[in-house]
Amino acid sequence: MSKRVYIAALGTETNQFVPFPTGLRGYQEHGIWHGDATQHAPTNFTAPVHVWRKETEKRGWTVIEGLSTFAAPSGTTVRKVYEDFRDEILDGIKAALPLDAVLINVHGAMVADGYDDCEGDLLSRIRAIVGPKVAIGAEFDLHCHLSALMLDSADVLVGYKEYPHTDTMERAAELFAIIADTVEGRVKPVMARYDCRMIAQYRTSVPPISEFVVRMKSLEGKDGILSVSLSHGFSFADVEDVGTRTLVVADGDMAKAQALAEQLGKELWDNRERYATKYLTVDEAMDRAASHNQGPLVLADRADNPGSGAPGDSTFVLKALIEREIGPALFGVMWDPMAFQIAEEAGEGARIRMRLGGKSGTVSGDPVDLDVTVKKIARNVFQPYGPVMSPLGDMALLSSEHVDIAICTRRNQTFHADAFRAVGAEPADYRVVIVKSAQHFYNGFVGVAKEILYVATPGAADPDVTRWPYTKRKTPFWPKVADPWK
């Protein structure tokens, strides 16, 4: 008899420290597919669903596709929006019974009004519907909160290993293979997690943390170890499970899974200073930029990364560039629909007085008033992000005395140098380039940049986790406490 597999996707990354919610419109902007996501071009979030359909049909099994939707990282999701999406998935599962497996693509750091652990809530409700014999698998972003409820409710959890997230489809295939083996009785997965008592950020594209990722991969497929994941955690949420955790999936041996999760977690702890991303202050970054003569120097404005839920309109670095008269500089992409409207009305070539940024509250700083020339207007701009294209809406390039500023109408982080090229700015021609991104820009700029540095500005995604008011985590963590094990 053909196996029956239900596939769906629901997620966002919730920054609880920003002053705006995530409502229905946030999901509509990125797409809501009611059972037909695989009939459309894949997005970064629906790509796993495409993989699962292909793999299911390859085996001659029956696939039932449910809801797929994702919202860009932002504030807490409105309760009704989450519950409506969740219930659509649950109702679809009920209608599809009997099932042999359920595969869900989630983020792992989704928070809604009344739900600190949306993924745990969703998975536990799925388990209550399908019972103990149906295999449940979930793929998650490595910036997740790996909760006990998630582990208790699913058979297999597999996280991205790479940041930038270049391996979403690879991890989807890995998860499917383990779930297929589970359904056919070849393996009996068990999972264990380990709390590293750390909250930090890790850039897996470069050593030494890249070496840790290679080691994780080398352990899989041997000695009964099915999968190894590192949950970096998502720093900008006040939930009980915030922080870094290791996860090991083993074939029927919980003691082995727990031992390896602890071993890897302790290895991470021992190397915490080496593995965690190092940041410059704004002043330090400006000093480096002022002395840099073999550009472009690329500076990541980490705290205003829309990919971490920040608005994308902060002005702290822009002000510093102007005050220090550092240039030629390229800055962006800044989210400022109002400024775009003014630039559009003025037209290309116009010289106007413009108020830029600082519109989303204190996390964005004060607006900056500049005399600028509207150099270029571009409509419906997309930028590459791995195998998919990511939207920026309409864009304009505004030129002041020392700085060219790219603005957009659709909030998104800067993934690729092509975002600037869309408005006629070639990053290679500038002394310094400032990108509103934390790390996903890396692959799109490493071929252009002479050097890449990371800046800790004030803002909604400030990487200094000692400043954030965590109230729900029950155990201490580094770096707020030097030794949280004492």
Report residues per predicted region.
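Structural motif
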Residues: 4-6, 62-64, 100-102, 134-138, ...
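Glycine-rich phosphate/diphosphate-binding loops that line cofactor/substrate pockets in enzymes
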Residues: 1-2, 57-61, 65, 91-102, ...
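Internal, active-site/partner-interface "lid" segment
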Residues: 183-212
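Active-site histidine-anchored catalytic micro-motif
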Residues: 6, 11-13, 75, 79-86, ...
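Low-complexity, highly charged intrinsically disordered N-terminal segments
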Residues: 53-73, 77-81, 85, 89-93
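Extended hydrophobic packing segments that form well-structured cores
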Residues: 46, 65, 269, 381-486
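N-terminal amphipathic/basic leader segments beginning at the initiator methionine
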Residues: 2-58
